[in-house]
């Protein structure tokens, strides 16, 4: 199935706290304070980031989008309704999955819980493979299309050359780095790496690979791990 699950359920609290340190104009800052970060307008067109992402996904060959949001998601529906051209050919659909807080909690849990709730609400995700990504990263058509190609492995992800992202050292240092073996199979993901770990995981070309949370999973193999994921 050409399915893409997009995670857009967070409160964007860290981003909103840092808005005053950005070079965004006053209008964009005001919008960013009101909406999820995936709905912030970008570029000359001022289309929301999510719309750019959906356009790239459609161009890459995806047909079914599962957008994970908080239950109060009317803003997402309002924004997407302003772009009917996305849905004009009838082969591109957006389904909404809601991430509910667990009983006794005011806030939802993390990524594993979000994906598990989406799979529970849409059982077809358990029966098929799907791509998973963040709603606040703008992935290229090329990267999204790569994960639709046939693979021998049941799961896969896109690794990015750290130096090619052109982010500040402070920002890039927060990215998880990927340990890959000689055949490019993932052996470990290192969150918040130290400078020593960065040096340790450089390859023979002095490259360090990082994750931008762009994955391909086989649903039936993934679900048991989501169900057993510890809370931390």
Residue ranges and their predicted role:
Residues 92-177:
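Conserved beta-loop-beta/alpha segment of the NTase-like Rossmann-fold superfamily
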Residues 1, 11, 54, 210-232:
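Terminal amphipathic alpha-helical/low-complexity segments used for targeting or macromolecular assembly
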Residues 1-6, 12-30, 43-128:
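Conserved N-terminal catalytic core of the sugar/cofactor nucleotidyltransferase
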Residues 37-43:
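Active-site mouth loops of central-metabolism enzymes
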Residues 38, 93-95, 185:
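Conserved beta-strand segments of alpha/beta enzyme cores
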Residues 29-37:
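Aromatic- and Gly/Pro-rich amphipathic surface segment
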Residues 14, 79, 189, 224-225:
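Residues that scaffold the ATP/ADP-binding catalytic core of kinase and kinase-like folds
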Residues 140-223:
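Conserved core of the sugar-phosphate nucleotidyltransferase
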